[in-house]
């Protein structure tokens, strides 16, 4: 490769959106997310629980775009201000979150953090009392898809617009 073959650098490297750069890959994410949500619904997991997973994963990853979006979607699904606000400290929040929600959040965190195999096995086994196999699989898929979309948004520097009110 010669200097003449080297592409010119972008004027604004922060104005590079992965979803726009490879739209075919981005368009494949939508059906994957839909399939994960459908699996959750078929397993008997409600929209509030799915939004708790989306929010917690986005908190762990620090994705402001997804946090903004899923905070609004969680509120639209009926999550209270209290449950939205306490989510970062869900372990200390006691009865604010049900046993099923706590197991779901534990599993979603493990999917996001990918601990050592022994710890992952422990989390999967310990959450089995509160989640069926279908629910466990759905939670893991929802968390994996959210991790994917978080990474796309973070790497693309997707902006968050201020909303008053």
Regions found by a protein language model. Name each.
Residues 1-165:
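Hydrophobic alpha-helical segments
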């Amino acid at each position: 490769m010669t200097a003449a073959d080297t592409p010119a650098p972008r004027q604004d490297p922060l104005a590079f959106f992965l979803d726009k750069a490879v739209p075919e890959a981005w368009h494949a994410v939508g059906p994957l997310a839909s399939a994960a949500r459908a699996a959750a619904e078929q397993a008997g997991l409600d929209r509030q629980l799915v939004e708790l997973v989306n929010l917690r994963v986005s908190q762990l990853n620090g994705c402001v775009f997804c946090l903004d979006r899923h905070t609004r979607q969680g509120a639209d699904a009926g999550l209270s201000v209290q449950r939205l606000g306490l989510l970062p400290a869900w372990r200390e929040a006691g009865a604010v979150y049900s046993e099923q929600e706590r197991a779901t959040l534990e599993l979603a965190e493990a999917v996001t953090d990918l601990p050592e195999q022994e710890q992952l096995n422990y989390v999967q086994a310990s959450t089995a009392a509160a989640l069926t196999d279908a629910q466990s699989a759905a939670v893991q898929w929802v968390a994996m898809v959210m991790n994917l979309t978080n990474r796309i948004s973070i790497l693309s520097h997707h902006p968050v617009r201020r909303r008053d009110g």
